[in-house]
């Protein structure tokens, strides 16, 4: 039970990190178009 929760938490953190890293790039692309 706790292992599943830990796995979901880890995936969620990875997704959030990805959004944080991709955010500026998306903003730049949006301004460029």
From Swiss-Prot:
Localisation per UniProt entry: Secreted
Tissue-specificity statement: Hemolymph.
Annotated keywords: Antibiotic, Antimicrobial, Fungicide, Hydroxylation, Immunity, Innate immunity, Secreted
Top-rank lineage group of the source organism: Eukaryota
Modified residues (5-hydroxylysine): 21
Induction of its expression: By bacterial infection.
Stored Pfam families: Cecropin (PF00272)
Function description: Cecropins have lytic and antibacterial activity against several Gram-positive and Gram-negative bacteria. Also has activity against fungi.
Name of the protein this chain belongs to: Cecropin-B
Taxonomy of the source species: Eukaryota, Metazoa, Ecdysozoa, Arthropoda, Hexapoda
